[in-house]
Amino acid sequence: MYQIVLGKVSTLSAGQLPDALIAQAPQGVRRASWLAGRVLLSRALSPLPEMVYGEQGKPAFSAGTPLWFNLSHSGDTIALLLSDEGEVGCDIEVIRPRDNWRSLANAVFSLGEHAEMEAERPERQLAAFWRIWTRKEAIVKQRGGSAWQIVSVDSTLPSALSVSQCQLDTLSLAVCTPTPFTLTPQTITKAL
């Protein structure tokens, strides 16, 4: 089973939240997205299992809980991928111009990924950049790795993992799962 839920950070992190949750939340710019992620998780699973953190900081449920999850946010949108199949990774990005995105692609994309981007019409290359970027991030996150490892990932090569991506309006969403799964708009639930 794979469950994908999208929500709005501003909505999920506002309103009446349990004092214990607010006390655990980090301060600063990560606070709203952290709270939104915990709210999404608690809506999907009640009671919420105890959480632990991996070597690179990836949150997970404690041993003995046969569920895995991954969270990602960009702008005001947050994505939750929940699984009973094994470790998962997801990445969501708002498709937006970014300073020196071509230089970044040259630095971290494989030859195959670069060829995929360059094969697009010029007006579609920015969307292709984000499509490839989200796939790479989802793979790294599935492994529990750090952002620095993105350069070592080639999302165009065959893999034992399943990597799927879709574009939703101005959002690029990718998932990396241990068993076959195809991401489509119909497989995504929107949080209220």
UniProtKB/Swiss-Prot annotation:
A single GO cellular-component term on record: cytosol
UniProt-listed Pfam families: ACPS (PF01648)
Transferase is among the record's keywords: yes
GO term, biological process aspect, one: lysine biosynthetic process via aminoadipic acid
Gene: acpT
UniProt-listed Enzyme Commission number(s): 2.7.8.7
Swiss-Prot/TrEMBL keywords: Transferase
Recorded superkingdom: Bacteria
Protein name as catalogued: 4'-phosphopantetheinyl transferase AcpT
A GO molecular-function annotation: magnesium ion binding
Family: Belongs to the P-Pant transferase superfamily. Gsp/Sfp/HetI/AcpT family.
Source organism (scientific name): Salmonella typhi
Function: May be involved in an alternative pathway for phosphopantetheinyl transfer and holo-ACP synthesis. The native apo-protein substrate is unknown.
Organism phylogeny: Bacteria, Pseudomonadati, Pseudomonadota, Gammaproteobacteria, Enterobacterales
Catalytic activity entry: apo-[ACP] + CoA = holo-[ACP] + adenosine 3',5'-bisphosphate + H(+)
